[in-house]
């Protein structure tokens, strides 16, 4: 069983942390992953830097740009991660846009993920139908879970279709805006979380966009299995460095 599925079966709320590989410094990637696991994080999303990240807010965009300037590439990321499973047990997901994966070669990328011990991918600009028709078989051959995003605007019919194609969790976008732009959830968002919960989907949902502290984590996990923190974590790295990871995580739980 995939590590993601094993983790989702645990009787606890899931905290997933996102960061941009190669930020703040090019060689921080492994240290950040190891420190996050030691701090009690359940799952990690490793951002594959891209020059045009459409869904990302300014904090993640800036970290992605800096990572590229630092010299991060897809090839280098896999090189950095080649021994990661000797020290890290929790699920690892690569989140990135489809262009760099296409350039690398989808088959080669998935093969490298499997060799490295990556458990899943989140590719915001890969449509579910294109995935199902052209890439699902390749992903599954290499043991990879593919995670799709849904928003408050996604129809119930579309959500059920995504649920039928998915085999891990569904990334529940808390609003239709970019990442890092919210500070708490209003009644409309809370009702949206509740509505999705009441659909009784086969895949659990994890909420992203707008979670930045203990309060918003608890709000997000009232109806869903877990929550993802990205912008707030990167902001903390920028201001306080890698040594602050344990303190940051301890203030969420």
UniProtKB/Swiss-Prot annotation:
HAMAP family: Trp_synth_alpha (MF_00131)
Annotated PROSITE patterns: TRP_SYNTHASE_ALPHA (PS00167)
Species of the source: Flavobacterium psychrophilum (strain ATCC 49511 / DSM 21280 / CIP 103535 / JIP02/86)
Pathway in which this enzyme or protein is active: Amino-acid biosynthesis; L-tryptophan biosynthesis; L-tryptophan from chorismate: step 5/5
A Pfam family the protein falls into: Trp_syntA
Subunit-level organization: Tetramer of two alpha and two beta chains.
GN (gene name): trpA
Protein's name in the database: Tryptophan synthase alpha chain
Keyword Lyase: yes
Function: The alpha subunit is responsible for the aldol cleavage of indoleglycerol phosphate to indole and glyceraldehyde 3-phosphate.
């Amino acid at each position: 069983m995939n590590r993601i599925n094993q983790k989702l079966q645990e009787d606890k709320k899931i905290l997933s942390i996102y960061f941009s590989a190669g930020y703040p410094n090019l060689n921080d990637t492994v240290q950040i992953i190891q420190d996050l696991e030691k701090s009690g994080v359940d799952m990690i999303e490793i951002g594959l830097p891209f020059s045009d990240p459409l869904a990302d807010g300014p904090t993640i965009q800036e970290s992605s740009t800096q990572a590229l300037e630092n010299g991060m590439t897809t090839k280098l990321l896999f090189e950095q991660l080649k021994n990661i499973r000797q020290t890290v047990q929790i699920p690892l997901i690569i989140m990135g846009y489809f262009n760099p994966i296409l350039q690398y070669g989808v088959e080669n990328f998935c093969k490298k993920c499997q060799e490295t011990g990556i458990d899943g991918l989140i590719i915001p600009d890969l449509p579910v139908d294109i995935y199902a028709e052209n890439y699902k078989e390749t992903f599954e051959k290499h043991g990879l879970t593919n995670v799709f995003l849904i928003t408050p605007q996604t129809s119930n019919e579309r959500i059920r279709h995504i649920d039928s194609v998915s085999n891990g969790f569904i990334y529940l976008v808390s609003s239709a805006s970019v990442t890092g732009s919210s500070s708490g959830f209003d009644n409309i968002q809370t009702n949206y979380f509740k509505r999705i919960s009441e659909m009784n989907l086969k895949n659990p949902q994890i909420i992203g966009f707008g979670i930045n502290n203990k309060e918003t984590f608890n709000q997000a996990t009232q109806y869903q299995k877990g929550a993802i923190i990205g912008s707030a974590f990167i902001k903390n790295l920028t201001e306080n460095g890698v040594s602050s990871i344990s303190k940051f995580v301890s203030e969420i739980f």
